[in-house]
Amino acid sequence: MESYKPVWLKGAVILAINLIDKGYKPVAVGLGERDFYIDVKSDTSITLDEVKKAINENVLANVSIENNQIVYKGNKVSIIEDKVSISTNLNPKYFEILNISTHHPNPNEQYVRIRGVAFETEEQLKDYLTWLEKAEETDHRLIGEKLDLFSFHEEAGSGLVLFHPKGQTIRNELIAFMREINDSMGYQEVYTSHVFKTDIWKISGHYTLYRDKLIVFNMEGDEYGVKPMNCPAHILIYKSKPRTYRDLPIRFSEFGHVYRWEKKGELYGLLRVRGFVQDDGHIFLREDQLREEIKMLISKTVEVWHKFGFKDDDIKPYLSTRPDESIGSDELWEKATNALISALQESGLKFGIKEKEGAFYGPKIDFEIRDSLGRWWQLSTIQVDFNLPERFKLEYIDKDGIKKRPVMVHRAIYGSIDRFVAILLEHFKGKLPTWLSSVQVRVLPITDEVNEYAEKVLNDMRKRRIRAEIDYAGETLSKRIKNAYDQGVPYILIVGKKEASEGTVTVRARGNIEVRNVKFEKFLELLITEIAQRDVEQTTVKALK
């Protein structure tokens, strides 16, 4: 997806200029997750035919780009994009308008938002539209609505998600798994506030280099910011008491709520939000401990992705190097970069290089994961930081009694838990592994006469902490089976008079697999094991066949 964005942005610029030539007033262009967008100031709606007529001329004559604005015939159009630049080498000729909508930035103004894509060849466009049609069938926003997982509400604010009980169940399972991973590496979990005085962000450098994402407000004469990252708070915990070389490494973890003011046109379901939770971690350690710590993090990261069924070919690490806007000396950056390279090489992983895509305080390893639709998602990150310990004057007492600076490592394996939920929903097409499913078993009594037995089966599962529910015989059995499949329930237990008299169940699983005359206790034992082991496949039904 990322590889398409330069040509999309160029296409958006071309279309904006064409719209100006047709008498329209575009005010901004930008990129979404799957397309470009153009905001046009207009008191009336704009039809698809009108937009298509504006795609006839693809000439960038008499156009200049100044201060991230398109300047053309007295018009200035803002370019809402800071990661993708406009290339003179690209020549988009084939356009597709995907959507036209209206929104009101204030009560007195109306904008028409045009969403589309552009490619250099007709074949690229056709391939993308075919892929997009397939992707829309597994759109996490539609799955989330169908399965009652989460919702967004304009009155609550754009990019601010509300997780419903079933959606929160998925998040809780992801957090519980990561807690186990953290425990295995020796982390101590902390909690820090959502809001801090901006003094902390000024010391860290976020106030200057991350200012456009910071949400800042004034109260009682002091300036506060809603935290976009957890690292400065963890630094203050480290500073709260003296540390010695024997204490290191110190590993803090937090499922921290962070908030970043993403541009409205870039918001996209759970994939791009303004408030989310990170599985964050920070390690304070000596330089001589750095390489082994990074190697352990790399190993654990790969272990986690294997648990979700991703193969080695689906996992691609990148070394991201120093960006143009950064803090710290060349010497510190070189030292940090070399530590990451050594750990990657010793781990035996093939890795790519992303020039100038490191954090402003240090280089990093980013892991990209390929989903079932062939898309690559940047998720895990490991960042080495010599700079924030210097800026916050962190210290530990070395064995020779001298005060020294620790090194800091920032890491997140899921990245954003909310975003990871979206990726999993699309990757598994709403059919999550049993351990992650909000409802793991649905019991279907064939008639009301066996309700008592069905309820006993239900309650026995709930006592064993299995998320089970019952669908009584209000509709036909085939209709209830279809409903359970459509709602992503991994296991369906059908009980009739025969099952009630014999203490058995008929088990149905995904893929229209059915196993009859299964002793309920045997099913329960196998299911508990499948869930405890966090299997991706339905090992219970495999063992029963």
Swiss-Prot record:
It catalyses: tRNA(Thr) + L-threonine + ATP = L-threonyl-tRNA(Thr) + AMP + diphosphate + H(+). InterPro entries: aa-tRNA-synt_IIb, aa-tRNA-synth_II, aa-tRNA-synth_II/BPL/LPL, Anticodon-bd, Anticodon-bd_dom_sf, Thr-tRNA-ligase_IIa, Thr/Ala-tRNA-synth_IIc_edit, ThrRS_anticodon. Residues 139-433 are annotated as: Catalytic. GO terms for biological process: threonyl-tRNA aminoacylation. Keywords: Aminoacyl-tRNA synthetase, ATP-binding, Cytoplasm, Ligase, Metal-binding, Nucleotide-binding, Protein biosynthesis, RNA-binding, tRNA-binding, Zinc. HAMAP family: Thr_tRNA_synth. Belongs to the class-II aminoacyl-tRNA synthetase family. This is Threonine--tRNA ligase catalytic subunit. It comes from Saccharolobus islandicus (strain L.S.2.15 / Lassen #1). The lineage of its organism: Archaea, Thermoproteota, Thermoprotei, Sulfolobales, Sulfolobaceae.
